[in-house]
Design a protein with these regions (language model features):
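A short, N-terminal "cap"/entry segment at the start of jelly-roll beta-barrel domains
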Residues: 1-42
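Ligand-binding loop in jelly-roll beta-barrel domains
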Residues: 82-108
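A generic "binding-loop/recognition-motif" signal
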Residues: 25, 48, 67, 83
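General beta-strand recognition
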Residues: 28, 61-63, 86, 97
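Short, conserved beta-strand element in jelly-roll/cupin
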Residues: 46-61
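Structural motif
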Residues: 59-61, 68, 84
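Short acidic-glycine-tyrosine-enriched beta hairpin
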Residues: 66-81
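Short histidine-centered beta-strand/loop micro-motifs
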Residues: 19-21, 41-47, 64, 88-90
Length: 111
């Protein structure tokens, strides 16, 4: 049986919605839906897992201590564990749908 990542997107959300699609001890795959959401001005993610994210719909800006990264559909980034970051902006007029993969293992990047 298959599911579709774009099914049942929440319409009105007071905050970003994170849904775990599948997980194991070392990997968690999530659907993240934002609709004009951003991290609080004084909040930084500083997590013990690595995180790979791709924007599937919408757009976003991620802020790091050393600069800003703009992301559009198809853009992906690998964020190493403990690299401080925050969501600075997501598209206000449509849902931004991300696929996020959090992992503990050391992986080699292709290419």
């Amino acid at each position: 049986m298959t599911d579709n990542i774009f099914d049942d997107l929440p319409l009105h959300m007071p905050r970003e919605v994170v849904q775990t699609l599948i997980q194991s001890a070392d990997v968690r795959i999530e659907r993240i839906v934002s609709h004009g959401h951003a991290s609080a001005a004084d909040f930084w993610y500083d997590q013990p897992q690595h995180e790979w994210v791709i924007v599937l719909q919408g757009a976003a800006k991620l802020q790091f201590e050393d600069g800003m990264v703009e992301m559009k559909v198809g853009d992906f980034i690998n964020i190493p564990a403990f690299r401080k970051h925050r969501v600075d902006w997501t598209t206000p007029d449509e849902a931004t749908v991300w696929l996020g993969v959090r992992y503990n293992a050391v992986l080699e990047e292709a290419g």
